[in-house]
Amino acid sequence: AHRTGALLAVFTFSNHPFACFRPDKVPPALITPEQKQSLLRDLGVDVLVDVPFDMSVARIAPEAFLEQLQALGYSCLVVGNNFTYGIRGEGTVETLAASAQRLGFKLVVRELVSDGPTVISSTAIRRLIAEGDVVEAAAMLGRLYSLSGVVAHGNERGRLLGFPTANIELAESKLAIPLGGVYAVQVNVNGQRYGGMANIGNNPTFGDVAAPRLETHIFDFSGDIYDSPISIDFVARVRGEV
């Protein structure tokens, strides 16, 4: 796009379509809105069109959907070979190709990307994260999988044992949570990056924590970061909980 003097734009939905049809079945997200904006910006995207998926979008006819997209002034569309659009996914790559000729825009259809025998998809990545295979999930994502949050006040048991931890509550998280256990991680604190070890789970060693929690011991770090935002990048699962 930039070689031709055009802007590079990405069209995406800000929520999962199940939010309209099966709100109890909405799968966990793999990225926060802020992470999405940051990653796309780093990839050179000039414009992010992040549209809420609602019933008006779900019911729109394929041709009407393309007509609304024309307001963006695009000259070229790039889609995957399994792309569908419009009500019940009635618009396909074949109908899009016919519309491209009629409306005068260039259409580029890309093959799906695979990691070995597995097609890379959000479903496949969620499965890997749920299994604790953050190494393979990172290979599919092209980055380390990350969780972020505000450091909460815990029971300070880690401090009593000589290794204070930064605690993030996960009960309200809308992101996929890796399988419980101990992970090697990288921690981003106040613009600095540190190594660390993190535990996900209900702390069975102590047995009195009701909600899932992410507890992280940050190597070579000392400081008060209560109520501060941090992000945890998962490198590898070391073991299950004890």
List the model feature ranges, each with a label.
Residues 2-72:
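Core alpha/beta nucleotide-donor-binding catalytic domains of modification enzymes
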Residues 14, 79-81, 234:
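A secondary-structure boundary/capping signal
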Residues 52, 81, 111, 200-202:
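Short secondary-structure boundary segments
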Residues 59-164, 240-241:
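Classical nucleotidyltransferase
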Residues 154-242:
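Phosphate/ribose-recognition catalytic cores of enzymes acting on nucleotide-derived substrates
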